[in-house]
Amino acid sequence: MQHNTYIYILTMKLLGFALAILLVVATCKPEEEITCEENVPFTCSQTDRFNKQDFESDFIFGVASSAYQIEGGRGRGLNVWDGFTHRYPEKGGADLGNGDTTCDSYRTWQKDLDVMEELGVKGYRFSFAWSRILPKGKRSRGINEDGINYYSGLIDGLIARNITPFVTLFHWDLPQSLQDEYEGFLDRTIIDDFKDYADLCFERFGDRVKHWITINQLFTVPTRGYALGTDAPGRCSQWVDKRCYGGDSSTEPYIVAHNQLLAHATVVDLYRTRYKYQGGKIGPVMITRWFLPYDDTLESKQATWRAKEFFLGWFMEPLTKGKYPYIMRKLVGNRLPKFNSTEARLLKGSYDFLGLNYYVTQYAHALDPSPPEKLTAMTDSLANLTSLDANGQPPGPPFSKGSYYHPRGMLNVMEHFKTKYGDPLIYVTENGFSTSGGPIPFTEAFHDYNRIDYLCSHLCFLRKAIKEKRVNVKGYFVWSLGDNYEFCNGYTVRFGLSYVDFNNVTADRDLKASGLWYQSFLRDTTKNQDILRSSLPFKNGDRKSLT
């Protein structure tokens, strides 16, 4: 396979070079290429003109993954995503996919390191599987030294390649034993169990890991796991989804979010008081979106503000002020838990950095209040989120079915966090684009030019946020290193810069066109016209220079 693959890549490079020459000769002068300030379209055909040198020398460019999505189930205890995808296989993806095997990175992690080295990245964000380290969830029930050794080898391999590890402690894969015992984050017992697990990780790995992430996307588990039932553990009100094994979509999301915040703050306090000597930093990851008014009415503008408060402020206000946003307290009422004075002090400032994941932008317009019997955390904001505005227009090019991306939203989100939340240190911990999945060959998966447009355009606006708005961003991680299991989508989509053959996961992971682009971007001045072309139409045939 490898011999044929190399021939194919060489052929694609030569073909790409011919296409690039034709584009230049037929439509424009080289200095007249689309600027990143345009919403659509974009072109990113020359990394000798836009590359990592446009960022500070200490800026970390990396890639990201998570344990359940790449490791496989070998050698660990069960987690809630095992339980969820086997209890509700149709919710694991249209292909009934799950993470039982996926990339089998537990055994093939050296191949992951090889791809990172080939790309030239300087950072790798990955997660520990809680149940691989503590198979029964609690430290008192036994430590899996094989799991410790696995992560230790991975960390050592990264450092040997001059790649900085960013470790996420919890990326949604709670040990099933804790969910069975007390419903996980619904119970405050989780705070002590999470602290014990984190304590072990700091103890065993803190000499080498200097960037710790407590919880990935604080918004996701409460909403998708406990309001909609679309994610593990699959709880919601019966009127939302009769398949949910229990739940209350009007109260449980707020309890889970509350306990997540307290668990996060408790672990940060542990690190600062007991492990400060290790010299590391710690913080949470937020899933972000940008929100635009559906139309020019006051109602839509107010709905947009409420959407930001419920989506971002739900977690950022406690982390900065020790309390929930006023509008949440007003609209949710006594369904929203309260922090006591000790908890508020624990929460305020409980981060050294923020990880921000950004993918898409949505429109918001006013939504009527729900009747008492149909209350849910998903509609309490009285804001309806859509992908098209009042004129039926999307905010940008297609992202996935029913959603669109808006690169300027990257700039908007970064500036929002700077001005509203005290100019924090930020790492963009996820940003990526999905293409069609399924059992397709490398020769088909290779042509992911839409991903190049996506990554380049977002990096353009990230650069603007740093240089023009002075946002304190120090790193950017592409999602993802390679194709993997995608939560709720199975293997029907591919996010990877590198190709994974799920019928032969031990095969080498070859770079797609986007991987070659990122590699070139990180090599500073390599002319890259041989592999790049814009997949988006030119606007009136006009091109401008990148600025």
Curated annotation (Swiss-Prot):
Annotated GO CC locations: apoplast; chloroplast; cytosolic ribosome; peroxisome; plant-type vacuole; plasmodesma; plastid; secretory vesicle
One of the GO biological process terms: abscisic acid-activated signaling pathway
Keyword match Heme: no
Pfam families: Glyco_hydro_1 (PF00232)
Binding site residues for a beta-D-glucoside: 69, 171, 216-217, 359, 430, 479, 486-487, 495
Tissue specificity note: Expressed in phloem-associated cells.
Residues linked to a glycan: 340, 384, 504
Reaction catalysed by this enzyme: a thioglucoside + H2O = a sugar + a thiol
Alphabetical UniProt keywords: Abscisic acid signaling pathway, Disulfide bond, Glycoprotein, Glycosidase, Hydrolase, Plant defense, Signal
Disulfide bridge partners, by residue number: 36-460, 44-456, 236-244
SUBUNIT field: Interacts with MVP1.
Family, per entry: Belongs to the glycosyl hydrolase 1 family.
Protein name: Myrosinase 2
Native species: Arabidopsis thaliana
